[in-house]
Amino acid sequence: MDALVILIPLLPLIAAALIGIGHLWGTLDGEAGERTTAAIASWAISVSCLVALVLLGGDLLEWTAGSFAAGQWLGSANLSVPINFVTSGFSMVLATLFAVLLFIIIRFSINYLHREAGFHRFFFLLSLYASAMLLLVLSGNAVGTFIGWEIAGLCSYLLIAYAYDRPVAAYNAMRVFITVRAGDVCFILGIGLSYAWAKTVDWSELNALSAQLSTGQASAIALCFAIAAFAKSAQLPFAPWLARAAEGPTPSSSGFYGAVMVHSGVYLVLLLQPVFERAPLVMALVAVVGLLTAIYGFVSGLTQTDVKSSLFFATSGQLGLMFLECGLGLWQLASWHLCAHAVVRGYQVLSAPSLMHHILGNPIKPVDREIAGMRWLYTASLQRFWIDQITDWFLVKPVRRLSHDLAYFDDHVVDRAMGIPLPSLRTISTLAQMEKRKIATRQSLYSTLGVVSSLALEKRKITPQQENQDNDFARGSGFTGDLTRRVTAVLYWFEDRLVIRGIGEDMIDYGRRLGLAANKIEQLLLNPGYLTLFVLTILLVAL
């Protein structure tokens, strides 16, 4: 029965692969393919949800073993990273809850994104994200959890930039991606320290061996995972990224920043409860950061003018309270708080568009007079306590400068030295670019048919610039590209002059004569006398 746990993250992954391949091949494209795409995504998450419910029932009835090992992924003399999953406890409860919420979000998205240009791209990313989140909570080791952690972050980045033609969406996606990566570095460091001191990356073994770790070792491991949790769950000083994530579509906002992904950090702290209990200073830090974030979310949310930003600041504040509960040792309360908040906040984000439609024009409840009279607090709330600018100065801008320098070095040194072919820079790299190119082609065709007559279409000629652009498509750069181009030119000359142009009447006549001569030689060899002479000649040569 425990083996069924593999299907929970696997089915959404298969759905994402089918949607992606179908969209790339053109079988799932436009409004005609929406029903198939929606059916693939819905059925995959539905079956995953049912399997999760079955395993949760088996856990409550004590029919499961609590874990399942599907094999070994990495292994050496000192390191073993198995492919194992958890089928009991809070991980199973959270996986079931997330599966149910993701099923609701996918069903909601089918009508919400109907006739959207990025319909298939959205469901591809949402299915991949569902697989990543289910892997994150069900994996029995740090490596598997980190894989789900990273894939979920990548899907978050791509869905924030869903409207990639809008500069604000693309910029906010980049900001969120860079900010969360700072926490991912600490996650990797925590895995390394766990292996260095506990000789394991398995969660259950790490928790069991936490009593043998010194206070300093346990504190270092707990601190690394705590910083990763702060970044993923939008705690100070990483909190501002959550408001920037509002650029994505409403269903993805609900799945990522309302109901599911933002709780990953709290889950990580709950998962490592024994390790954190061995590190009292880190638990105190978790409590302080949670309290400050709760205050920050409450005050900043008072001055927001749109419903999604208000909900996201409220989410950040509630997550801060969960970290405060973990820091105070109220682990059970934090678990219940997480589950309840995921349900409530997911519903609020999904119903936000409908709410705005029904309460349009109604005044909102004013803040208390005491708070309203604090001008400095009002200014700080409008500026979001200047944390966004501080994060820009110390994190985002240095990373952008470094990436700009690396890109310049790659373009002007590496590419010219290696001769990277230009098609690698010009081909379609994302589903979004492919959709954009298809839409542009359709619009160009429609405008041409509407303005230009059929006679003008027949007389249309390709300009020299277009011809040169087409010819330059497969042209390489650098020494290697130049050498390849010259060799290709020689081979083309040989093919054109000696093969293509050489096939004329003379070549056909020569071929016919050669065939007749070969037939005569064959008839002579088949003559018994000549055949005997030929055999004797070969024997004499051999002797």
Predicted features by range, described:
Residues 1-415, 419, 425-450, 454-481, ...:
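...captures the hydrophobic TM-helix bundle architecture rather than a specific catalytic motif
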